[in-house]
Amino acid sequence: TTSTNATDKLFSQAYACINTCNAVINRAADVTEGDKNVLKVVVAEAKCLRAYYYLVLVTNYGNVTLVTTESTDTKIMNPTRSSQEEIYNLIITDLQEAAADLNTTPMDGNYARVTKKAALGLLARAYAQGAGEGLSENGVSYWQRAKEVAEDLIANMASYNAYLYDDVEDVWAQSNNRNNKEALFIASGPQAGTDAFTYGSYGANKLFTFTFCDPNKLSDIYPVGSKQNYFYGRVNNNYYAPSKYLVDCFDARYDKRWENSFTTAFSLFSMVQAGWRTYDDKNATITLTEDLCTKYGIDSKFVGKKIYPYVDVNAINLGSNGGNQYVASVWPKGEYSGDVNKLVKVKNPYVNPYPLAEDEDRFIVYLSKEYLSDAEKAKRGYICVNIDDLFAADGKYKETFIDAQQTNTYTLFPSLNKFNFNFEGGFYGSNLQCKTGDMFIMRMAEVYLIAAEAEERLGNGAKAAEYLNVLRKRAWRNEADFEAN
């Protein structure tokens, strides 16, 4: 394997986890005391996890070496690659046995532990991936098996304690992060302020810092530095931006997954609730000067106009278990009193209004998915950047100025907001880099996609469309447009 840290770490850690699973599975027969039903579930959990890790390995590295026994001090100097059939046979068998023995509710009420729906979801995924390798089971195509498992999970969602939200916004609502009803399998982040958080090693969970751009690159109009950004967090890495291809996959006129995936309008914030920053503080409310308007291409008629904070951020002290959490509420448009009683809770404060209105006065910069002409930009009292202008002809991001004034707007990009958590218990603010929400490994929507792909592969295009349309409808911005299309 490569010595590159990320890929090597994935490979090594997957095998380390497999070794633990092997120990649980193989030592279970030696356990003579305790509740046999509990033991059965623990073994089923280990089989589900072992199958998952092997699925990760075969997906990323191809034919790896199957190991089903606990490691010893003896090193295997010449490991042999197992065949696709051997690897998938183990994955399928583990998941079938796990699904048979797991309950629909998690052991000890710990929602982070795998249940029957997790095993079934992964089984459908494994069949679909194996089908792509041309595999079959007793003469039956893996596509047929993927169809059967996925459709059973869909048809019997309630009995498996599975769920699909009617509105895609609810999937990413901050209040739904913990115990998300659509989740089949998660990587659970610890509740900030608890002993599990305090004594665990969770400082490395900084994913959002890599997927967000830094609006402070426009420091004269966005004066709050990354180390003091209590709203977005310390977004100082800025490595991962969506490709031109990915951006073009969205038709944001109809698809509200766009703003529920990417933040494209950036604002300042007040901290009235915390008593740290008033509503009209110079770092919360900006007045457009002639110089700022000239520099950023804002029409001169907006000189003297104020841009107000979009949110107010509260500071909630964690006491002896850490620093503060910074939870945001939204100032309604047109509300300038600074009265915290007027604040409203929204599903996700990082989901900006879309499309951004011409008269919006709570955002400093807007990255527009739809191309805005100069005349259209002139109607807006904030910085407008066409996302298409961020890309060169070869589809790569430009690395130099995109405007005549040579501003740093070229450093901005649509920012993936799915790892930027903002709820009490999911945001540890000691250095504004660590956020500890739950992350999906698999959710129910994927099962619909698997069912659709399997049906299409088996020649049932109309049935495939039915499954796809369930997902399309809940993502559609206006139901009337969905019905018309």
Give the ranges of each region predicted by the language model.
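Short coil/turn linking the two alpha-helices of tandem helical-hairpin repeats
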Residues: 32, 58-59, 63-65, 106, ...
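An aromatic- and glycine-enriched ligand-binding surface/loop that stacks and positions planar moieties
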Residues: 1, 125-380
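Conserved, well-structured interaction surfaces
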Residues: 1-61, 76-89, 95-111, 385, ...
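TPR-repeat structural position
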Residues: 14, 88, 140-143, 461
